[in-house]
Regions:
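Glycine-rich flexible loops
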Residues: 1-211
C-alpha cells in the first residue's frame, strides 16, 4: 500500500486490512453532504479524490473516510478506515485503504475535545463564506476563522483548528485551506456530540449563507 507523494503528511501504518463495522451512518452522512456540493470531486487536476471527510469516535481511536475517494456518494464499507492511534507522526490503522489525508487533524480534535463524538469537514463556497453581507453575520451564525493559514495533513493543522473553536458549537473556517485546483472553496470544520448534529450543523450554516 503506497502513500501518495506529497498528499499524506504523516506515516500511515497498516495494522490489518480489516474493514471497520457499522459505518452505514458515516457513509450516509457523506452522501448527504455530497448532495449539497460540500464534498465535491476533484476537477482540473490529475489527482483522484474529493473534498472533505467525516469521522466518528470509537472506543479506541475513530473511524474516518479513506483518502483520495473519487466521490463520496454511496461509499462502500471498505471506503472507511479505523484509525487506532496516532503517535509521533505514525497513524496506525485498520482498513483496506489509506486513511484521510486530514486524519491528524481529526485525531487532535478528538483528543482536545473528549466529549465530541463526530467531526465533519467540508469545503464551502467562497462566494457564500466571504460575501460582504455574510461576513457581517459570522458572529450571529457562530462562524469563526482560524487565526493562521491552515494547510493540510499535519499535527500543526490540528492544533490551529482546535485553537479556533471558541465553543464546541462553533463553525470554523480553516483560513486559506483550499487546494490549487479548487480555489473557489475553503475548508470548514464542525464538531459535535453526535454525527447527526455535526451534519445538521454544517447543512444549517450552508443554507443560512444562501439566504
Amino acid at each position: 500500500m503506497s502513500t501518495p507523494s506529497g498528499f499524506i503528511q504523516f506515516n500511515p501504518v497498516q495494522l490489518s486490512a480489516t474493514v471497520p463495522e457499522n459505518t452505514s451512518p458515516l457513509r450516509e452522512a457523506c452522501t448527504t453532504l455530497a448532495a449539497y456540493d460540500l464534498h465535491t470531486s476533484y476537477t482540473g487536476t490529475d489527482l483522484i479524490g474529493s473534498n472533505g471527510n467525516v469521522s466518528v469516535r470509537r472506543t479506541s481511536g475513530f473511524v474516518v473516510t479513506a483518502t483520495q475517494l473519487p466521490s463520496k456518494h454511496n461509499l462502500a464499507p471498505e471506503d472507511c478506515v479505523h484509525l487506532e492511534t496516532c503517535v509521533d507522526g505514525d497513524a496506525r490503522f485498520h482498513g483496506a485503504k489509506l486513511p484521510s489525508s486530514e486524519s491528524i487533524m481529526h485525531w487532535h480534535l478528538f483528543e482536545t475535545f473528549p466529549d465530541i463524538q463526530a467531526i465533519v469537514h467540508v469545503h464551502e463556497s467562497n462566494a457564500l463564506l466571504y460575501s460582504e453581507p455574510n461576513r457581517t453575520r459570522w458572529a450571529e451564525l457562530g462562524i469563526v476563522e482560524s487565526a493562521q493559514d491552515i494547510g493540510g495533513g499535519t499535527i500543526e493543522v490540528g492544533r490551529a483548528t482546535a485553537e479556533a473553536f471558541t465553543t464546541e458549537s462553533s463553525y470554523v473556517i480553516l483560513k486559506n485551506h483550499r487546494p490549487d485546483w479548487d480555489p473557489g472553496r475553503t475548508g470548514t470544520v464542525v464538531i459535535h456530540r453526535t454525527l447527526e448534529e455535526a451534519v445538521n450543523s454544517a447543512l444549517k450554516i450552508h443554507e443560512a449563507l444562501k439566504q
